[in-house]
């Protein structure tokens, strides 16, 4: 047996993690404390990316490092992956072309997972994601939104939110305000599914 041991369980699937620790039917119910960690600041990421490039004899401008942060919405795994992809393509100084090629490579790498996550979604669910991707975060039951995004009836919105939250594709970021859970999935949908 172990004594004086602490465990740290972590993950980015917020809804799943909450269910594991807050639902009495799960084995980790009230297992410990939940901590919601904020994202690393853009300034800290920018400094880190620039320093890591410099250490290896390459250079990336602060502006390009900031773009990496903004494209990935500062999601740690994506920031690191995209920065690495840009670093791989950089001879001496990273360029906008290196960044765009890195983004394409990131989308290519994530595509099989994104196909798997979206292939069984209903047309209404895809339309709901489309609305969110286009900046609709509230007011889904308004007739103009229902019509523009073909979401069905106002009663359908509750079911859509529930189903997509359970799949960890969307998250509530403020009262009655919804966002995509994964910024790269959102980009993939916009660029490669809806061709926007």
List where the protein language model places each region.
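Amphipathic alpha-helical "lid/sensor" segments that cap RecA-like P-loop NTPase cores
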Residues: 46, 50-113, 123
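Short, flexible helix/strand-to-coil boundary loops that buttress conserved ligand/catalytic motifs
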Residues: 20-21, 49, 83, 174, ...
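Small/polar loops that bind or transfer phosphate-bearing groups
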Residues: 8-9, 37, 181
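Sensor-1/coupling segment of RecA-like P-loop NTPase cores
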Residues: 1-25, 31
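C-terminal leucine-rich, beta-strand-based interaction scaffolds used for sensing/assembly
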Residues: 112-196
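Conserved AAA+ ATPase "SRH/arginine-finger" region at the nucleotide-binding site
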Residues: 33-44
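Short, solvent-exposed loop/turn segments at secondary-structure junctions
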Residues: 13-16, 42, 185
């Amino acid at each position: 047996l172990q004594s004086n041991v602490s465990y740290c369980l972590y993950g980015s699937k917020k809804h799943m993690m909450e269910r594991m620790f807050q639902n009495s039917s799960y084995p980790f119910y009230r297992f410990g404390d939940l901590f919601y960690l904020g994202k690393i600041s853009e300034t800290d990421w920018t400094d880190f990316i620039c320093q890591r490039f410099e250490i290896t004899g390459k250079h990336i401008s602060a502006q390009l490092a900031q773009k990496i942060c903004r494209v990935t919405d500062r999601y740690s795994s994506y920031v690191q992956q995209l920065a690495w992809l840009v670093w791989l393509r950089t001879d001496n100084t990273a360029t906008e072309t290196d960044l765009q090629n890195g983004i394409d490579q990131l989308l290519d790498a994530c595509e099989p997972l994104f196909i798997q996550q979206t292939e069984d979604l209903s047309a209404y669910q895809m339309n709901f994601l489309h609305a969110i991707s286009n900046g609709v975060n509230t007011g889904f039951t308004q007739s103009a939104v229902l019509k523009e995004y073909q979401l069905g009836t106002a009663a359908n919105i509750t079911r859509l939110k529930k189903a997509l939250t359970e799949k960890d594709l969307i998250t509530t970021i403020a009262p009655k305000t919804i966002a995509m859970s994964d910024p790269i999935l959102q980009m993939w949908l916009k660029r490669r599914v809806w061709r926007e």
